[in-house]
UniProtKB/Swiss-Prot annotation:
Residues of the propeptide: 26-39
Similarity annotation: Belongs to the formicidae venom precursor-01 superfamily.
Annotated compartments: Secreted
Signal peptide positions (record): 1-25
Name this protein carries in UniProt: U-poneritoxin(01)-Om4b
Keywords in alphabetical order: Antibiotic, Antimicrobial, Disulfide bond, Fungicide, Secreted, Signal
Organism: Odontomachus monticola (Trap-jaw ant)
Length: 68
């Protein structure tokens, strides 16, 4: 028994829908991971910059570059 053209068209559209959903779900997961990574980097940079601002004047003063 040979499948009709309508059956083949339905299967093609169905497979395209499945592929589209899988690609879209993967893109959303990548976007979420990227957002979390950026937030972590910004937080880490903020902490590091706070430490630099806290300790750099003391270090420069000890080396004689900045008079306190």
């Amino acid at each position: 028994m040979k499948p009709s053209g309508l059956t083949l068209a339905f299967l093609v559209v169905f497979m395209m829908a499945i592929m589209y959903n899988s690609v879209q779900a993967e893109a959303l997961a990548d976007a979420d991971a990227e957002a979390f990574a950026e937030a972590g980097v910004k937080e880490l940079f903020g902490k590091a910059w706070g430490l630099v601002k806290k300790h750099l004047p003391k270090a420069c003063g000890l080396m004689g570059y900045v008079k306190q």
